[in-house]
């Protein structure tokens, strides 16, 4: 432990002297109040400290004490359904302890409840050889999540004691005799430094799709379990709603939601909505699988920088248990702004638009911790982390540094479009500018699993939308009637895809989530109409007659999004109805 004293204070940056025994990334207690800070730069005996709490009232001469430990998180039972701030302080227990609606400075509360007892069930017995990553036993943390207690990293040997029963997170539950003869006494909890990624046995190629229930994403721009996606868009385009929808309905085991520098009422929406929503995969409340990290815009700026790392470290912990995890960061732009502020106060050489020159590497460090892995341990298991980051470029300008550095790393780009949002088309993901580099892998995976021609249908639907975009300029100049019959059909079918398929109501209990079988049935109906109508045109029918003759079935196709999943056969039955009505138009002569 090293004690120095403050010489300057500049917002969240404090410089202290007499710190020659300290190290970069050490956690410090700053001032008489004992504020939490982290050393981010060392020059001789002077340490530059990033303080994670409000520094007003702190002055030169006050003491700074190092702990000798890096910024770490506590990992164990009690994480699920909990809400933490950026440095893993539990907000509900913080409020009870301080009797304040705001964060009181200098208050230290353990991240995991030291009084709560958890029922531990051993899975291994005394005398067995264990290595890092082996599952020693389980705790049923919620109705959905079985918390698997693992042997910590760099610990291996012979299990000499393991106890069943109810324990707090600090009680000794097992003992391991290591190769050097020492006895390691382990509890239900372990700690891990947030800036260091947790080790894995092997990184694997992600192939299984993350089903979000959002048709535009799952059909055209899918992301895999273990993939990375970015959601850039201007103010009001729907970034947060897209993130909330994925957090609610994605087919993952655990969701980590990081509210980083965004409005507090968005986290309030999460707290109000999530407990009432039922996960379609488990039938339980969505909060039973969710960890919330709230670092809203009125909280200290420096803690935003830590909140992203706190979230991804908790995600890695659950991944190591063999779970699939999704982490939502809303928004990485606010995190980058925190980096820019600290860089400016350190008087570092600025890069593009004042951001630090190392912005790209910091963003890469975060996203590369996502992925599909084979975990440590003698038991064979896989885990995944899917990272989805919202980006808030000023004025929707995606040429700014945060968006550009993000797009260099992620493989999925869901570009939110202000004109679409203004037309009340939600999700406002622009199908012409967005892309997914996982499309081929996901398409072939679904074709194998469902024995269908899904990837071909997706290609045909996208070709129709692209053809519509090329015809739009002609239509604006000379009108729709100047187009050929075939092109008029293309415009009509593209409108069906846009309005009846891609547009989705997040506030409708049925339309808010669509399974893959329902998506395929809906898309098949629209493509069947296009195919049969195109044949009818080539046989001499008129476009107007086809549209009038199929008005009823097209209306039923439009309303099929509101048909519940259990009535899927009703949607599939429309395919034959489409063919029958177009044949009926032809039978009447088509003219």
From Swiss-Prot:
One annotated Gene Ontology cellular component of this protein: proton-transporting ATP synthase complex
Keyword Ion transport: yes
GO molecular function: ATP binding; proton-transporting ATP synthase activity, rotational mechanism; proton-transporting ATPase activity, rotational mechanism
Protein name: V-type ATP synthase alpha chain
EC assignment: 7.1.2.2
Binding site for ATP: 233-240
Designated gene of the protein: atpA
UniProt KW keywords: ATP synthesis, ATP-binding, Hydrogen ion transport, Ion transport, Nucleotide-binding, Translocase, Transport
Transmembrane segments: none
Top EC class, one word: translocase
Matching InterPro entries: ATP-synt_VA_C (IPR055190), ATP-synth_a_Xtn (IPR031686), ATP_synth_asu-like_sf (IPR023366), ATPase_a/bsu_AS (IPR020003), ATPase_F1/V1/A1_a/bsu_N (IPR004100), ATPase_F1/V1/A1_a/bsu_N_sf (IPR036121), ATPase_F1/V1/A1_a/bsu_nucl-bd (IPR000194), ATPase_F1/V1_b/a_C (IPR024034)
Source organism: Streptococcus pyogenes serotype M12 (strain MGAS2096)
Reactions catalysed, as given in the entry: ATP + H2O + 4 H(+)(in) = ADP + phosphate + 5 H(+)(out)
Similarity section: Belongs to the ATPase alpha/beta chains family.
Gene3D superfamilies membership: 2.40.30.20, 2.40.50.100, Bovine Mitochondrial F1-atpase, Atp Synthase Beta Chain, Chain D, domain 3 (1.10.1140.10), P-loop containing nucleotide triphosphate hydrolases (3.40.50.300)
GO biological processes: proton motive force-driven plasma membrane ATP synthesis
Chain's role: Produces ATP from ADP in the presence of a proton gradient across the membrane. The V-type alpha chain is a catalytic subunit.
């Amino acid at each position: 432990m090293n004690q120095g004293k403050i010489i300057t204070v500049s917002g969240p940056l404090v410089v202290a002297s007499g710190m020659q025994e300290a190290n970069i990334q050490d956690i410090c207690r700053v001032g008489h109040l004992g504020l939490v800070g982290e050393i981010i730069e060392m020059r001789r005996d002077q340490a530059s400290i990033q303080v994670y709490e409000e520094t007003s009232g702190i002055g030169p001469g006050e003491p700074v004490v190092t702990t000798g430990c890096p910024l770490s998180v506590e990992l164990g039972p009690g994480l699920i359904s909990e809400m933490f701030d950026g440095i893993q302080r539990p907000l509900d227990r913080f409020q009870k302890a301080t009797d304040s609606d705001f964060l009181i400075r200098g208050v230290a509360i353990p991240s995991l409840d030291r009084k709560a007892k958890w029922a531990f069930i051993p899975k291994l017995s005394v005398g067995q050889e264990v290595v890092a990553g082996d599952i020693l036993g389980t705790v049923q943390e919620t109705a959905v999540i079985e918390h698997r207690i693992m042997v910590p990293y760099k610990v291996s040997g012979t299990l000499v004691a393991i106890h069943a029963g109810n324990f707090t997170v600090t009680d000794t539950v097992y003992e391991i005799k290591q190769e050097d003869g020492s006895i390691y006494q382990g509890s239900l909890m372990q700690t891990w430094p947030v800036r260091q990624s947790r080790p894995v046995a092997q990184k694997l190629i992600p192939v299984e799709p993350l089903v979000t229930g959002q048709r535009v994403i799952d059909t055209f721009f899918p992301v895999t379990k273990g993939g990375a996606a970015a959601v850039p868009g201007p103010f009001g385009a729907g970034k947060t709603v897209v993130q909330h929808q994925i957090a609610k309905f994605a087919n993952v085991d655990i969701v980590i939601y990081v509210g980083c520098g965004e409005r507090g009422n968005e986290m309030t929406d999460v707290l109000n909505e999530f407990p009432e929503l039922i996960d379609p995969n488990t039938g339980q409340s969505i909060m039973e699988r969710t960890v919330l990290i709230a670092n809203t815009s009125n909280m200290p700026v420096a803690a935003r920088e830590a909140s992203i790392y706190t979230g991804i470290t908790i995600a890695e912990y659950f991944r190591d248990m063999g779970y699939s995890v999704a982490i939502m960061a809303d928004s990485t732009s606010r995190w980058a702004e925190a980096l820019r502020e600290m860089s400016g106060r350190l008087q570092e050489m600025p890069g593009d638009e004042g951001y630090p020159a190392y912005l790209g590497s910091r963003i890469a460090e975060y996203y590369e911790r996502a992925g599909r892995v084979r975990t440590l341990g003698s038991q064979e298991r896989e885990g995944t982390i899917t990272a989805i980051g919202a980006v808030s470029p000023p004025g929707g300008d995606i040429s700014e540094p945060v968006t550009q550095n993000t797009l260099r790393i992620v493989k999925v780009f869901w570009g939110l479009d202000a004109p679409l949002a203004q037309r009340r088309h939600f999700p406002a993901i622009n199908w012409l500018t967005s892309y997914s580099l996982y499309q081929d892998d996901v398409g072939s995976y679904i074709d194998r699993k469902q024995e269908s021609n899904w990837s071909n249908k997706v290609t045909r639907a996208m070709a129709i939308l692209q053809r519509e975009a090329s015809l739009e300029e002609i239509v604006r100049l000379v009108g729709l009637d100047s187009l050929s019959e075939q092109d008029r059909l293309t415009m009509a079918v593209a409108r069906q895809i846009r309005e009846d398929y891609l547009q989705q109501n997040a506030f409708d209990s049925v339309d808010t989530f669509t399974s893959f079988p329902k998506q395929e049935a809906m898309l098949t109906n629209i493509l069947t109409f296009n195919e049969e109508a195109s044949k009818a045109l080539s046989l001499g029918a008129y476009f107007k007659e086809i549209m009038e003759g199929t008005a009823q079935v097209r209306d039923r196709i439009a309303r099929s999004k509101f048909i519940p999943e259990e009535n899927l056969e009703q949607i599939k039955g429309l395919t034959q109805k489409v063919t029958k009505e177009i044949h009926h138009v032809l039978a009447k002569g088509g003219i």
